Design a protein with these regions (language model features):
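Metal-dependent de-N-acetylase/amidase catalytic core
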Residues: 153-154, 159-191, 196
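RNase H-like two-metal-ion nuclease catalytic core shared by retroviral integrases
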Residues: 198-203
């Protein structure tokens, strides 16, 4: 519990340091079932009820109909229910043959991201919270330097004018090792994923 409070303080610091959340925000979380998104639901779900700024959180789980694995949707819903958060399931798919220049992992990620924007708009959200942590941000920086020769990574806050939406990363100051320990403490149930495309990913 002390560790959870420590992580909450890091999330609080990120919220105020980067202006991630303000009063009246309605925020969508995409819950994949991994430890990072489960922790994000716990952190923002709790914070939305007892701390300022006051904001609303809704949770969605995106099912890719052409990927042969399924998460335990009842379990994911129970994690949202614990904080009194609305939970929605959205099903979509992608066709890997439409653009052979792009990897299936890219197309899947892009399709999920587009679905998040559509769901956020449908439910009146003005922000989408992603579960990237400090290690993800540093890894992206290194990958961009190695593969593209450019210095750049995922910002804590990104305004998407095209979609009239903001992407926020409230766990940008949180180390992955702390999230791993929280997952054990909270007893997060590991979701089994066997993606046929995962061996081709560079991450």
């Amino acid at each position: 519990e002390l560790l959870f409070r420590k992580v909450e303080e890091k999330v609080k610091k990120a919220i105020f340091e980067y202006g991630l959340i303000v009063d009246g925000d309605r925020i969508l979380i995409g819950l994949s079932g991994g430890k990072d998104s489960l922790a994000l639901v716990d952190l923002l779900g709790r914070r939305s009820k007892i701390f300022r700024p006051r904001f609303e959180v809704i949770v969605t789980h995106i099912v890719m109909s052409n990927i042969p694995y399924r998460s335990d949707i009842d379990y994911l819903k129970s994690r949202a229910d614990e904080h009194g958060l609305s939970f929605f399931v959205h099903e979509t798919s992608f066709d890997a043959s439409t653009d052979t220049r792009k990897s299936p992992c890219f197309l899947c990620s892009w399709t999920r991201r587009k679905a998040l924007f559509d769901i956020a708009k449908r439910h009146g959200c003005n922000k989408i919270a992603l579960g990237h942590h400090q290690d993800d941000i540093l890894e992206t920086l290194l990958m961009n330097m190695i593969h593209q020769g450019a210095i750049g990574t995922m910002p804590p806050r990104l305004k998407m004018d095209k979609f009239d939406m903001e992407i926020i990363r409230p766990m940008c100051l949180v180390e992955e090792k702390d999230l791993t320990r929280i997952a054990v403490w909270r007893g997060y149930r590991k979701q089994i994923k066997n993606c046929p495309y995962e061996s081709g990913s560079s991450r």
